[in-house]
């Protein structure tokens, strides 16, 4: 069935000058992937310091690292429940708020239990954003550019991991393993 005369389709709007706006919105939404990658990778450089500060053995360090993964599972389940209810954009905003709370809580954690909870919160944000961001980008993108725009999310995850490792190296006290 053809579109009524004079009514613009999603793809027509892409051609009529909104290309830059949609691309910018997609890149901003994909920044959730940057946070995903950064919060996943940054622990590697901090783990020895955390272990020393909280007197952790291997199991304690494993709990700190894996708490973000457990949170991501919880976050993806939460995302299934809220995305259709509040929308993809609001879900991304909510995950951004959880990223902020989790990051601040991680920075000021007085003990390993608080750090585990903070990292669990970061994982929840990762889980929500990993579901919401690609869906949101898919919905705003015209069919001809959908794959390209959605791939920004994965690119941002990779860039986030790279930034985390560069950050880890910059703040390490020595250049050895």
What are these regions (language model features)?
Residues 2-177:
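Transmembrane-helix signature of 12-pass secondary carriers
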């Amino acid at each position: 069935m053809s579109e009524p005369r004079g009514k613009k389709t999603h793809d027509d709007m892409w051609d009529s000058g909104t290309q830059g706006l949609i691309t910018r919105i997609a890149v901003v939404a994909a920044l959730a992937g940057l946070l995903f990658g950064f919060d996943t990778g940054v622990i590697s450089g901090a783990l020895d310091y955390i272990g020393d500060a909280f007197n952790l053995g291997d199991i304690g360090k494993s709990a700190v690292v894996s708490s973000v993964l457990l949170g991501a599972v919880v976050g993806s389940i939460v995302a299934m429940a809220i995305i259709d209810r509040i929308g993809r954009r609001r879900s991304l905003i909510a995950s951004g708020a959880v990223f902020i709370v989790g990051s601040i809580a991680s920075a000021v954690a007085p003990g390993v239990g608080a750090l585990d909870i903070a990292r669990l919160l970061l994982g929840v944000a990762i889980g929500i954003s990993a579901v919401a961001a690609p869906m949101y980008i898919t919905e705003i993108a015209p069919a001809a550019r959908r794959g390209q725009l959605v791939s920004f999310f994965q690119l941002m995850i990779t860039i986030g991991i790279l930034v985390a490792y560069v950050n880890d190296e910059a703040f390490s006290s020595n250049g050895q393993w």
